[in-house]
Amino acid sequence: MARHGIFIAPFEELSEPAVVAELAAETDAAGWDGFFVWDHIAYRAPVRAVGDPWVGLAAIACATSRVRIGPMITPLSRRRVHKVARETVTLDLLSSGRLTLGVGLGSPRNGEFEPFGEVADPRERAKLLDQGLEDLTRYWSGECEPVPVQQPRIPVWVAGEWPHRRPVRRALRWDGLFPTGLPGPDALAELAAQARAARPAGEPFDLVVDLPPGEDPQPWAQAGATWVVTDFGMNPPESQVREVIEAGPVRLSL
């Protein structure tokens, strides 16, 4: 059965950590399964106010007791991996083992690579991502202490834009795939079949889809989604987010 999460951008009126923590607490109480945040340091117009997702996640961890939490997605190429290792372990401890780390290449179109002196070339960012994931695993395994609550590692979801295949191959080495730009459930079903063929039988692997508020999650769950997250876009009214959270998730019978 698919699990259901809330997925918000900490922008504008949602850039305030106390507001995000309050929304996360309401999500926890309303029966949702996860609360995830976009990870950006800047964004294209008309967005101006961008909250730090990692400080926000610390507040979220303290405000909740049940839901999974995490960034979706962190471009590792613009981060110092040893710092991410400390942040993720600390969040995993703070949340008692509820962190999932979403990673990907990120997108230069939002103005958060070259303007800040970061690598923009996609091939170089891909190399840095792969190396960063290997380094994270090494740090989590005990090279740096403390170690995460979750063992053998904090779950890693890898994002990639449909129909590119390289992110899919990368994701299959980790714990889940967050494909963006899917044309429909049939495309997700293809990815689910690919995952079943490539992974050992019975080994957990998440397929995550993001849907706008109100879209029927049933076809996506039937196609193989293990997580359906409600994505409000870059600047929703806080009232809309609260309304969806308070209504609770749509539970599916497959």
Task: Label the predicted regions.
Residues 1-254:
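Active-site-adjacent structural elements that line small-molecule/cofactor binding pockets in enzymes
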